[in-house]
From Swiss-Prot:
Lineage: Eukaryota, Rhodophyta, Bangiophyceae, Cyanidiales, Cyanidiaceae
Gene for this chain: rps5
Subcellular compartments: Plastid, Chloroplast
Keyword Ribonucleoprotein: yes
Full protein name: Small ribosomal subunit protein uS5c
GO annotation terms (biological process): translation
Keyword set, alphabetical order: Chloroplast, Plastid, Ribonucleoprotein, Ribosomal protein, RNA-binding, rRNA-binding
């Protein structure tokens, strides 16, 4: 039981977006909630997940489970930055990441900032181009981190 609690505490989660969606059925509209969540351990492991349910709490739980299924490992430098510049593209969203000097902080906005902070990255520059959808930007940031780590090996 102690080990289970330690594993639970090691992951941090952050809700990026809660959206009420509707399915039109014969009797009217069936409302549900779609939640976008980022999960990370602040030590080079991060994932993005989405969940949909009739109430917000169930949707958040489903999103966390989905995010933990899609975790990626990132190679961090001693200054808690990425190894080298990279680019990720998902749908219309394009995210550029560039390593920054120690003390620069996370210079990113929206969903990309959440992904960087929960991955444990403390010094990075980013630029978002194309779409402004938080889901697409978060997934583009993950792809950029993945390509940065893949090229480092």
């Amino acid at each position: 039981m102690q080990n289970m609690n330690e594993q639970q505490e090691q992951w941090q989660e952050r809700v990026i977006q809660i959206r009420r969606v509707a399915k039109v059925v014969k009797g009217g509209k069936k409302l549900s909630f779609r939640v976008l969540v980022v999960v990370g351990n602040l030590n080079g492991c991060v994932g993005v997940g989405m969940g949909k349910a009739a109430d917000v709490m169930s949707a958040v739980t489903k999103a966390v489970v989905d995010a933990k299924k899609q975790l990626i490992n990132i190679t961090l430098t001693p200054t808690n930055s990425i190894v080298h510049a990279s680019q990720g593209r998902f749908s219309a969203a394009v995210v550029f990441l560039k390593p920054a000097a120690s003390g620069s902080g996370v210079i990113a906005g929206g969903a990309v900032r959440s992904v960087m902070e929960l991955a444990g990255i403390q010094n990075v520059l980013s630029k978002q181009l194309g779409g402004s959808n938080p889901l697409n930007n978060a997934k583009a940031a993950l792809l950029a981190l993945k390509s940065s780590s893949a090229n480092a090996r």
